[in-house]
Structure formats: C-alpha cells, structure tokens
C-alpha cells in the first residue's frame, strides 16, 4: 500500500444522517454571488453535546509499524485545532530532541534554584564571613563559614512544620519567607516534572507524524521553512480527508441544513491552518488594533478630594477613551499610565476574555454571536474582571515571584503583530528590526550630553591611567596600597574604569551619519508600524520619544513588569469593567463562520469587501466610507459579502445605533498589511476572495505605474500605496513587502508574466468566437486576405457551404495557410471551448477578461459587416 493512502480510515457515517436538532429552527439556504450560504441556528447553552464514542481513540494499535501508527493518529484526530497547535509547537521547538533537552534543562534550572538558594540561606554563617577581625585566625576558607549538617537541620525543621515535633535541638537559619519560597518552588518543580512526563506520548506521536507522514526527519526541522510544512500537511489532508469533520463543525452543519451540506472535503491550505492555530490570538490582535481595552490605571476619587488633586491626572467620564465609558454619570478618576500590556496583565486578559469567549475545545461559544444574551454576557464579563482584580491583589507577592523566576517581556508588541502571523514569524520580524531601531534611537543629536560626557570621560580616564601606570611600576600597590581606608588601587581602578566606559558609550561616534528618516524607514519595513501622526515627521523629537517607548531599556521593562503586578488589580477592578459592553459587541460583530473552519475573527478572513479597502490608492478614512456587512455598499462597489468560501456573519437589527457608528475597518490598514505579509510568507497561497485578488492586482498596478514614471502616490493619503507595501511612493521608500520590495519582487514579476500570457490566450481564443461561414472571414485578418478567402470558399463546391460545425470551421482555417501559432490557437479553441475564457487564472480576473472579450466581440461584429459587404461585391463581380 502506498504512502498516504488512508486504509486505516474509520467508517464515517453520512454527515446528514441522525440529525440531533431536527425541528429546531428552520432550514434555510440561499445562494449569493455563486456561493451557497447556510443560515445556522445557535445551539442553546443548556444543550450539552453528546459524549463522543471512544471506540476509535481506544482502538488497539498492536502490530502496527511506526508509519501506520502515525497514520492511525492522523485519521483519528477529533480536534484539528489542537492537533495543528501541537504540530506548530513541535516545529517551533525544533524537533523532539531539542524539546526534550530544553525541558530537562528547565527542570535542572529549577532544581538548581531550589538547591542553591537553600545553600546560600541555610548553609553559610554570614557572621563569620563578614567578620571585621583581621588577625591570623581570620576567615580564609569556605569550610570555615559553612554550617555543619545544614541540610539535615533544614529537613528536620520541615518535619517539625508538618508533624509539630520538638525542634529545639535544631538551629534552623531559614526565615519563613524562604521556607514559603522553597515550598512554592518545589511545588512548581513537581508540576513541571508531571507535565513533562505526560507530554512524552504526544511528543512521540508528533515525531512519528513528522518523520513518517510528512517525510521530514528530525534533523531537518531546524532548517525547513514553515510554508513547506504547511504544503506537506495539505498533501496528507488530500489523501486522508477524514479530519474534515474536525471539532464537530461539519457534522453540526449537516444536521442543521440537511443533505445540501454534503460536499467533498476542502483542502487544508496555509490560510486555514493559520486561522486554526491563531483563532484566539487573532481576537486579541483585533482588540488592540481597535483600541477597545482601557489599560490605564483609573482609581475613582471622591468629590471632596478632587479640589486637592491636580487636574492633569484627573479624568471624567466625558474624557473617557472609550465610547462606552462616556455614558457613565459624571465622576472623577485618578488616571495615569498608558495602554501598554505587561506579562501579568496579559495572563489576566487571556483568562478573562479568551477563557470566557472560547470553550474547552478552543471554539467560540455560540451564545456570543446572539444579541439576546448580550446583557448577561456583559454582566458576566464585568464580574470576571472584578473577581480577577481581587484575586490579583491577594496573590500579588506570588505573581512577582513567578515573574522573577519565569521571565518578562514587552507586550506593546501586540500592536505590531498582524493577523494570521505565527509567533516565530513575528519574532523573526522584530529581531531583524532590533539593530536598526537601536541605531535610530542612538543617533539622535545629544550635543549637550555629549559635551558633558566627554569631560567626565577625560577626568575618569586621567585618574585610571595614573593608577594603572603606578600599578605597572610597583605591582604591590595594586593590592596593598589603600587610597582610602580599606579601598585599594584595585577598587578605584574598577570605579574609574566603569565611569570611563559609561561616559564614552554616551558619546556618539564621530563618523556616524545622521539620517533618522532612513533608519526609521528601515525599522518600519520590518515592524509594519507607521502611525498617521508620524508621517512627514520622522526626523522630529516627538516621533523619537514615541518610538523610544516601544524599544525601552531592559531594566525599565523589568521594573515596569514588577510595578504592573501592583497596578493590575486597579486596572481589572476599575478600568476594564466599563469596557465589557464594547468587548462583547466586538466579539459578536466581528465574528464570522467559515465552513470547515468554524467561527473566526472577521479580520483574519481577509474579506476586503466587508472590512477592507479594495482600492490601493484609496486614503484610509475613519467612519466615512467604512461600511459593514449590513451597512451599505462595500468598498469599491463590491457587494457586501461575496467570499468564495461560505461564511455566515451574525448581527442583530435590534442595535442599529451600535452598528451605525461601528468602524468596520481595522485601524492603520492592519488587515491590508496582514494580508500582504501573509501572501509574502506563503507565495503559493491563492486568496479565495475575489476582492482580495483585486486588491493585490491594483496594488501591483500602482507599483508598476510608479516604477514607469506614473508618479508616486503621496504617503499623506494614508492609503496602502503610501505605506511600506505600496512600492515606490510611501513614506518608507517602497521597500518591504511592496511590489518593489525584496520579499515579493520575484513573486510579483512572475504573476505579471502569467497574467500577460493569460491575456494573450484570451485574445487568441476570443478572435474565433464568431464562427466563419461563407460570408465571414477571420476577424483579425486584413480585408484583402478576407476577400481572397471568400472567393476560394465560393469555388470550393457545395459540400463546404453551410458547414457550420467546429470540424468544418477547423478545416477551412487549416487550408487557408495559417501559421503554426494560429494552428495552436485553433487547437485550444477546439479542445477547451468558449467557456474557458471565464476561468483563465487563479487570481479572479474574470471581470477584466470579460470586458476585453466584449470589446473583441464588437470589433468582430464590425468586421463581419465589412466582410459581408465585400462578399456581396465580390459575388457580383464573379457573376
């Protein structure tokens, strides 16, 4: 049996049989734009899904080889989202050996922290170590300061804590805080060991999947790009499509709409895989892009104290950053901080939002797409925020401890991250921008600081040089000569050397070229972040200060993370609950259902007709021109809602005010940028939405015009053409992912060549659409050749007259001395027919081709009339 054949595929019952929801809701189907849409009813919250049969999962695998085990695992996947997440985690971890090694070293690191901290606190007598006695009997060896049997005393003290036995005989030196620290760290260590032991079977399954099904050995995972893994997964899905019923989506659809839902399994492409892996992260990216989260510290202030607090740090309900907060009664808040996401706050948001929106299988809970549950959901989210605020206030010391042990990061990066962008691609993009960003921050003129630091460096260097020369002359001065009491030459050499290094580091290099605009343009090329207020001001101090907040010093990040643990309870208790209504509305209004994938964030679908700007030269606007699925014409005249894959969007007509004032487009062209970056990352992926293809074609056309002197599009318009993707005319110089960029240049040139060939084939085939008869010549030939052709046909005899068949037409064309190129066009016409004109390319350029064909038909009709007149005159002449 060949590889990839699913002989172990279990027998799958008809997806339309056994409907569980018969009689619940109407079965409605409609067709729009050539696609079938299904109006699905929402399962009530009280309805529990029936437990799935464990027969397949408990099916024995005795006697199967490694490949058969991998194939058995694939065809028995019941949670495709979770499986693909494990596939990606395995790829990101660089294979089973790297993953196991990293986890074992993490366990050893935790164990070392426990053992070393116990040794430092319990096993050293610091009174002897820091003794001021400077006699011959002074401390000189480690064993002189060690506490005898310190580990034994520590263990007996723990037994005393547990059993309440007498511990007077044991001199335990550890404090209660250290004891608590060790208990928590030990529990964390045990949890890590248990998690690692439970993950070993899944790692082995992933190893077999990569090695035997995908054909990727463990050594090649570190060098193989992710798009190649996606392509291999698509090939496996093509041969073994059983997991198309993943997460119960297809079964539920079939039960609701009947046999019409039966369709061949859809392929699993890069877009579907990214939507499944990043189903939850895409919502967070959209929330930050739409600025729906108020992460500033807001503390209510009593009215009697407002007169004693500066007005600059007070905020009223009317000044609230969110529309939902402006409806509250007049109230003053003490507000400070900015909308920055720290690690501790991100943990809480994931629990409060994602844990509330998604079920245990990672699917969107269906009550979030219904308007009638809105009030209950808003109240539930508010209670969730308040509860987590109280919980964070209680456990703040332990959260700080975990941050110190674990790690801490900057999380303003959610503003940089794009839809359907996997974490390793995002990290690679930021890593490429780091050196250039550092160069941009450092090169800004600091003349006054440089003058002072040059003076400090001169003074410190002079002292350090004198001490160094003296030490070289007499080495005994280095260790025994005390400049101040108990401070030798060695100490002051270290002090002056440090001052010299710091001061010289703050002086810019003399040969450095000052060009902040070029540096920031290069940074934007990778970060894809260029706010409108920055454009035209890249050289200003304002942009420099704003940018410096994004690339802060590590020590500042460290203190901000620790401070956020204290401030997070206030944000959760006072700032986020008023945002609950806007968040619930966002989840409902920006959630769509894609057949075969499930509910996803609408921006991640790349539906330009609903949520994007199809015109690459169109300036980005706010509410003007931004339309929703139910709110008027879509961008560039496209009818709202014509994706090639069936989608169902849930909105309600009972909230027209909210829908009317909702900005349906992403801020700062986030969806357009995400689409282009995803296309550049996966060149083989073809967008299924016609509006996406049209956007890409227009962007390429704009870049082509700019390269040929058509004039660049001004960056001030705010459109994509003026951005890093526009190619030529933006504030970023047309680099990056644009048609002039290094990433997409070859891909776009190939697309242009393919499109030119498609137009040539269309022209060739369209020239034969009008069938020639006894009075009709080839529409593209010269009139004189047409006249001679008619004479030959008239003299050809009765047998050839009136032969309107394709074969007869082909014979006449061949006997007229056609060239080889014309014979090839005749063969294409005969084999493929007229209908192929409307399916020329994979880029949905049918509208353009139809317009070209319409013009050709008119030319053919005119020449037909001319040929008819010539035929009559020639007939009279022959008579």
Swiss-Prot record:
InterPro entries attached to this UniProt entry: Autophagy-rel_prot_9
Enzymatic reactions: a 1,2-diacyl-sn-glycero-3-phosphocholine(in) = a 1,2-diacyl-sn-glycero-3-phosphocholine(out); a 1,2-diacyl-sn-glycero-3-phospho-L-serine(in) = a 1,2-diacyl-sn-glycero-3-phospho-L-serine(out); a 1,2-diacyl-sn-glycero-3-phosphoethanolamine(in) = a 1,2-diacyl-sn-glycero-3-phosphoethanolamine(out); a 1,2-diacyl-sn-glycero-3-phospho-(1D-myo-inositol-3-phosphate)(in) = a 1,2-diacyl-sn-glycero-3-phospho-(1D-myo-inositol-3-phosphate)(out)
Any single biological process term in GO: autophagy of mitochondrion
GO cellular component terms given for this protein: autophagosome; cytoplasmic vesicle membrane; endoplasmic reticulum membrane; Golgi membrane; phagophore assembly site membrane
Intramembrane ranges, chain numbering: 385-405, 555-575
Sequence ranges of Basic and acidic residues compositional bias: 798-817
Chief location: membrane
Entry remark concerning the domains of this protein: Forms a homotrimer with a solvated central pore, which is connected laterally to the cytosol through the cavity within each protomer. Acts as a lipid scramblase that uses its central pore to function: the central pore opens laterally to accommodate lipid headgroups, thereby enabling lipid flipping and redistribution of lipids added to the outer leaflet of ATG9-containing vesicles, thereby enabling growth into autophagosomes.
Record-given protein name: Autophagy-related protein 9
Organism: Cryptococcus neoformans var. neoformans serotype D (strain B-3501A) (Filobasidiella neoformans)
Species lineage: Eukaryota, Fungi, Dikarya, Basidiomycota, Agaricomycotina
């Amino acid at each position: 049996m060949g590889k990839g054949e699913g002989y172990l595929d279990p027998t799958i019952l008809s997806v339309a049989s056994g409907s569980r929801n018969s009689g619940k809701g109407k079965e409605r189907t409609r067709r729009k734009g050539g696609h079938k849409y299904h109006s699905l009813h929402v399962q009530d919250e009280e309805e529990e899904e029936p437990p799935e049969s464990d027969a397949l999962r408990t099916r024995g695998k005795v006697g199967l080889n490694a490949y058969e085990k991998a194939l058995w695992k694939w065809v028995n996947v019941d949670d495709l989202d979770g499986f693909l997440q494990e596939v990606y985690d395995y790829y990101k971890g660089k294979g089973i050996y790297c993953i196991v090694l990293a986890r074992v070293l993490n366990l050893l690191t935790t164990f070392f922290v426990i053992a070393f901290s116990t040794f430092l606190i319990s096993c050293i007598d610091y009174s002897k170590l820091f003794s001021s006695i400077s006699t011959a009997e002074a401390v000189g060896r480690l064993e002189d300061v060690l506490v005898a049997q310190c580990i034994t005393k520590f263990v007996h003290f723990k037994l005393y804590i547990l059993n309440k036995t007498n511990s007077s005989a044991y001199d335990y030196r550890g404090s209660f805080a250290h004891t608590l620290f060790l208990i928590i760290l030990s529990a964390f260590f045990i949890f890590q060991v248990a998690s690692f032991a439970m993950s070993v079977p899944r790692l082995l399954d992933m190893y077999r999947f990569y090695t035997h099904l995908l054909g990727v050995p463990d050594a090649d995972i570190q060098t193989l790009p992710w798009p190649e893994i996606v392509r291999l997964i698509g090939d496996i899905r093509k041969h073994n499509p059983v997991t198309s019923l993943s997460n119960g989506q297809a079964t539920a659809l079939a039960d609701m709409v009947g046999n019409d839902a039966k369709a061949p399994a859809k392929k699993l492409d890069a877009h579907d895989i990214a939507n499944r892996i990043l189903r939850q992260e895409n919502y967070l990216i959209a929330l930050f892009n739409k600025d729906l989260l108020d992460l500033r510290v807001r503390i209510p202030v009593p009215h009697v104290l407002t007169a004693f607090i500066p007005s600059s740090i007070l905020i009223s309900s009317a000044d609230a950053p969110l529309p939902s907060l402006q409806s509250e009664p007049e109230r003053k808040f003490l507000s400070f901080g900015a909308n920055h996401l720290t690690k501790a706050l991100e943990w809480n948001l994931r629990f409060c939002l994602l844990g509330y929106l998604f079920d245990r299988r990672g699917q969107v809970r269906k009550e979030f797409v219904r308007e009638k549950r809105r009030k209950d959901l808003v109240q539930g989210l508010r209670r969730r925020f308040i509860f987590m605020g109280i919980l964070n206030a209680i456990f703040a010391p332990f959260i700080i401890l975990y941050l110190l042990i674990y790690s801490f990061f900057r999380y303003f990066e959610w503003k940089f991250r794009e839809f359907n962008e996997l974490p390793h691609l995002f990290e690679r993009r930021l890593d490429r921008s780091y050196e250039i960003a550092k160069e941009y921050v450092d090169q800004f003129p600091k003349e006054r600081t440089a003058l002072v630091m040059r003076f400090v460096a001169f003074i410190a260097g002079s002292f350090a040089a004198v001490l160094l020369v003296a030490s070289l002359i007499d080495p005994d001065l280095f260790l025994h000569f005390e400049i101040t009491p108990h401070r030798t030459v060695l100490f002051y050499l270290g002090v002056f050397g440090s001052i010299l290094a710091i001061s010289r580091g703050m002086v810019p290099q003399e040969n450095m070229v000052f060009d902040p605009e070029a540096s920031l343009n290069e940074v934007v090329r990778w970060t894809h972040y260029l706010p409108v207020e920055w454009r035209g001001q890249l050289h200003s101090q304002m942009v420099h200060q704003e940018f410096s907040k994004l690339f802060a010093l590590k020590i500042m990040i460290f203190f901000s993370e620790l401070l956020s643990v204290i401030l997070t309870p206030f944000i959760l208790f006072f700032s986020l609950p008023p945002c609950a209504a806007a968040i619930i509305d966002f989840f409902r209004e920006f959630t769509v259902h894609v057949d075969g994938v499930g509910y996803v964030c609408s921006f991640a679908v790349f539906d330009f007709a609903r949520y994007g700007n199809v015109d690459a030269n169109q300036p980005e606007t706010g509410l003007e021109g931004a339309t929703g699925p139910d709110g008027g014409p879509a961008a560039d005249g496209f009818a709202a809602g014509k994706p090639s894959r069936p989608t169902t969007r849930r909105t309600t007509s009972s909230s027209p005010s909210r829908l009317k004032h909702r900005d349906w487009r992403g801020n700062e062209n986030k969806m357009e940028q995400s689409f282009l970056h995803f296309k550049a990352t996966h060149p083989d992926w073809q967008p299924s939405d016609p509006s996406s293809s049209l956007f890409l074609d227009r962007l390429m056309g704009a870049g082509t015009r700019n390269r040929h002197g058509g004039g660049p599009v001004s960056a001030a318009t705010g459109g994509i053409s003026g951005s890093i993707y526009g190619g030529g005319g933006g504030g970023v110089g047309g680099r990056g992912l644009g048609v002039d960029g290094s990433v997409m240049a070859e891909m776009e040139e190939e697309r242009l060549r393919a499109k030119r060939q498609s137009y040539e084939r269309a022209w060739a085939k369209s020239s034969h659409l009008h069938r020639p008869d006894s009075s009709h010549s080839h529409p593209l030939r010269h009139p004189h050749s047409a006249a001679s052709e008619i004479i030959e046909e008239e003299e050809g005899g009765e047998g050839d007259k009136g032969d309107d068949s394709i074969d007869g037409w082909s014979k006449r064309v061949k006997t007229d001395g056609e060239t080889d190129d014309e014979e090839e066009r005749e063969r294409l016409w005969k084999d493929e027919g007229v209908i192929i004109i409307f399916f020329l390319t994979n880029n949905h350029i049918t509208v353009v081709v139809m317009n070209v064909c319409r013009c050709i038909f008119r030319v053919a009709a005119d020449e037909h009339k001319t040929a008819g007149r010539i035929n009559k005159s020639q007939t009279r002449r022959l008579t």
